[in-house]
A protein has these predicted regions:
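Membrane-embedded helix-loop-helix hairpins and adjacent transmembrane boundary segments
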Residues: 1-478, 495-500
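Short amphipathic alpha-helical elements of helix-turn-helix/winged-helix folds
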Residues: 482-490, 565-573
Length: 628
């Protein structure tokens, strides 16, 4: 057992660090947008680090050494770890830009926009149950690992870890979570590389590894390739795709990005970085444990056995802090996914639809606390531990993943088709999991995909009349006018409209549907990015008040007078202070970010900054300033 004083000091020091990060970032929180999606300021590099760092989560750290022992190094590296990273890369390339352009905080919010409220509610329920299961799995996994190493009871470990990540998330929201994500990579990655180097030298490059012919030198090892049960190559790949595409965990990462480029690049480079820098060392740990640790022990204990018996006290404590940080980081991101769903899809949608982002900050923090309490209870009392909790999450994420992809690429999906598909898919998946067949015949992930897909497509084809449905709105009001004004100003993406109007996305989509029915607004297309890009028709333009001379001049360049004032101020002062920009433009300080994003989108400002966004005027922007 590791020295208690060293372990306590190191863990306590790390906990103080993350709480300090939460306290620091709490000063950046002025609205629910700041709390849940960082005001959409996360840079490509930070997003890539945060997403890639998920590969160091406690569940992956425990599973990869185990699979190296039972299946072989290459199956663990290629078919488990790298399959997850490839799923993240595919996610970024196929729908990363779409996620950022929708402006939706949650998967469920988008499904409510595109389909119906009842589909949104079912999906949101799946997200709540699934992300809480993921959180509980990570907490249960690291807490169980720490019991034999530290001597502390399992329940105490659960409460201490949950309480800490709850505190810094409560204070700093997604900002705190993101910085902790990067911090745990900086702290943890050197430990893994030092340990791997020392132990490879100690074992003479695994010269005496038991079963080296298949564990190290066979590409497939003992891994079945095309079985429908788990583990197999094809089932692992599909499971990771469903986890990534169907989870709010990854959606909120990409919708927090400062641009579509940062969303796509964050996922792609995060996945590439995980393959290159993370998955190999994790897979090697299992082989090193098998070679170095004597006696009989379960493969699932490989990480703990290696840390407890083959490392010096300093390196052992360092590894514990590394995996503790990774576990808390992963769990806190899932916590943001859970609380954002609870707030956006239930509280704001049904109880406070017209609440301002500032009014939603404290309820958002309460949602974080409630989700954390449920997570701790599930980790303590759920039978079966981390593995079963992850299996449960697969059941919840499967049907939403199918519906999400269909809404993006298949325009014939209908509200009734989606609702019927997601409900039957969910029921079938849970029922299949309760029996023995998911372990012996076919994993439940295949049931989730097949049932949801088949039912959704068939029912949608039978209910095509719903595609021409009219909006429930019957007359123009101030929200319709505000929406058309935003489109006239060049805010043509759904995300720009959602951020500009600061109300629930489903409500905004109903406004857009009515305006399209009336011929005032048109949608650029029916699939992918085109279905979330809009423009004002000539009839719609005629419904708005005439522009003043100043507004007409600015409108030639897709700007408002406030946009122009901000651009001029930055060009002449190089000052990006929000208070100064607010004073110069007359725009409320909390809304300045939307003007900045608009100017960046049109190429008038160039953005940079590792953490917070900084900008400078582009050559194109200076030309506009001269003309204005």
């Amino acid at each position: 057992m590791l020295p208690q004083w060293m372990l306590i000091l190191s863990v306590f020091g790390f906990l103080i660090l993350v709480i300090w990060i939460g306290r620091l970032t709490s000063k950046w929180i002025e609205s629910s947008s700041d709390f849940f999606v960082t005001g959409r300021e996360i840079s490509l590099l930070i997003n890539a680090c945060a997403i890639g760092g998920i590969g160091l989560s406690a569940s992956v750290v425990a599973a990869m050494p185990m699979f190296s022992i039972t299946l072989g190094f290459w199956p663990s590296f290629l078919f488990y770890g790298s399959m997850w990273a490839v799923a993240v890369i595919i996610y970024g390339l196929t729908i990363g830009g779409f996620i950022r352009r929708t402006g939706a905080y949650t998967i469920s919010e988008w499904l409510g926009m595109r389909l119906s409220t009842k589909t949104r509610v079912i999906c949101a329920t799946c997200q709540l149950l699934g992300t809480i299961s993921v959180m509980a799995a990570n907490i249960a996994g690291i807490s169980a690992v720490l019991v034999p190493i530290t001597g502390y009871p399992y329940v105490l470990n659960v409460l201490a870890i949950t309480g800490t990540f709850l505190l810094y998330t409560f204070l700093g929201g997604m900002w705190a979570v993101t910085i902790v994500d990067v911090a745990h990579i900086i702290i943890g990655m050197p430990a893994y590389y030092i340990v791997i180097s020392l132990l490879l030298a100690k074992t003479n490059l695994l010269a005496n590894l038991p079963g080296a012919d298949w564990r190290l030198y066979s590409l497939t090892g003992h891994m079945p390739l095309f079985r429908l049960t788990f583990p197999s190559m094809i089932t692992m790949g599909i499971t990771w795709l469903v986890f990534v595409f169907g989870s709010q965990y990854y959606w909120i990462r990409l919708t927090s990005a400062r641009s579509e480029r940062a969303a796509i690049g964050g996922a792609v480079w995060g996945g590439v970085g995980a393959i290159i820098f993370i998955m190999g060392p994790l897979a090697l740990l299992g082989l090193l444990a098998l070679d170095l640790v004597p006696g009989q022990w379960a493969p699932a204990q490989a990480w703990g056995q290696l840390v407890g018996h083959s490392l010096s006290s300093v390196m052992g404590v360092w590894m514990i802090v590394a995996v503790l940080g990774a576990s808390m980081s992963t769990a806190s991101t899932a916590l943001m996914g859970t609380s954002s769903t609870a707030m956006r899809d239930f509280y704001q949608r049904f109880f406070r639809p017209r609440a301002t982002p500032q009014e939603l900050v404290n309820p958002s923090r309460v949602a974080v606390l409630i989700a954390g309490v449920f997570t701790a209870l599930l980790a303590i009392f759920y039978p079966g531990g981390a593995a079963w909790l992850l299996a449960v999450a697969a059941a919840w994420f499967g049907p939403p993943a199918v519906i999400l992809v269909l809404t993006i690429y298949w325009p014939r999906i209908t509200p009734t088709g989606s609702f019927t598909g997601i409900v039957t898919g969910l029921i079938a998946t849970v029922a299949w999991q309760l029996g023995p067949y998911w372990q012996t015949t076919m994993h439940m992930i295949w049931v989730a995909i097949c049932v949801t897909l088949v039912v959704t497509v068939i029912v949608s084809l039978l209910t095509q009349s719903e595609r021409g449905r009219k909006s429930l709105t019957t007359e123009l009001d101030e929200y319709h006018t505000q929406l058309m004004s935003l489109l006239r100003q060049g805010r043509t993406t759904l995300g720009a409209v959602v951020d500009g109007m600061k109300v629930d996305g489903e409500r905004i989509y109903h406004y857009l549907q009515y305006l399209m029915d009336m011929g005032y607004v048109k949608k650029e297309g029916e699939t992918s990015l085109s279905q979330v890009t809009f423009s004002l028709t000539s009839e719609g333009n005629d419904m708005l008040p005439a522009l003043s001379t100043e507004e007409q001049l600015s409108a030639k360049f897709a700007l408002t007078p406030a946009d122009a004032a901000i651009l001029k101020y930055i060009a002449t002062t190089n000052n990006f202070d929000a208070a100064s920009l607010s004073e110069a433009s007359g725009v409320a300080r909390s809304n300045i970010n939307q003007n900045i994003i608009h100017l960046v989108t049109h190429g008038y400002l160039l953005e940079s900054g590792l953490w917070r966004r900084t900008v400078k005027v582009s050559p194109q922007g200076r030309e506009i300033v001269d003309k204005l």
